[in-house]
Amino acid sequence: MDQSVLNRTLELIKPCPGLLNHVQEVAKLATHVSGTLGLNEKTLKMAALVHDVGKYSWPQELHSKYPLYTRDLQIVRTHPLVGEKILCEFWPEIPKTIRQLVRWHHERPGGLGYPDQLHNPPIEVLVLAACDVYSAITSDRPYRPGVLAVDQALIEVAKFAPPQVVAALADAISKQCVNY
């Protein structure tokens, strides 16, 4: 990824409360987990750093609003597609894998995710999703404190991620890739 593309993307998300820290934490975790599983660390790291760029399009108040109502959830669920579009504009030669990871980071096995309801998301998608969910659960948000219990957060991740991903994530956490 061209450094200027990464810089432009990170500049977009800076005004979003906590988002820059979140994507940096997800990138650290995803790099460790992908390395443990023999996946492409560079690809997962790049995708993690830009996976939430679509949140840039949200109304500012949505970043700290709770609870979210039906209309709010409709907006929230657009961010993978908006992020993919932004990246394609910034980076016309974006690798297909990174584009797909950004688009699919909320996909879950059995067609339970969005935006495409994939039944069998690729392992890379589940790695990014697991790291994203872990970071989201354990981080403080304007409307709630983060969960402090690592085990509690990993139980949530295990609801959709394969055991090898959960184990690699637990290893990353134990090696203090992130604060816990």
For each predicted feature, which ranges?
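Histidine- and acidic-residue-rich, metal-dependent catalytic cores
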Residues: 2-180
